Regions:
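Catalytic phosphate/metal-binding cores of nucleic-acid and nucleotide-processing enzymes, i.e., regions
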Residues: 1-82
Length: 82
């Protein structure tokens, strides 16, 4: 794993990976990249990722906060960092 930061938030059915490193989309600019997974597979999640894409990058911390709220709304589950 490249040097940087990573958090994984468990929402029951989905997990949200949040990273920032020299290889992530926007990481060298201090921005974040997210991916949503369902078990071992990354998945598209309408309202979170774009159709045909399982990763979303170049996100500010406010963008990430908004995504955390959206996934909470979608799942009805309070996220827990794992």
């Amino acid at each position: 794993m490249p040097k940087g930061v990573q958090a994984i938030v468990d929402f029951g059915k989905y997990e949200l990976s949040i990273i920032q490193n020299e290889m992530s989309y926007g990481g060298t600019q201090g921005l974040y990249e997210i991916a949503v997974s369902d078990g071992d597979d990354q998945v598209e999640l309408p309202g979170i990722t774009e159709t045909g894409d399982t990763v979303k990058g170049w996100l500010t911390s406010d963008d990430v906060d908004a995504i955390l709220i959206k996934i909470h709304t979608i799942t009805g589950t309070e996220g827990k960092q794992i």
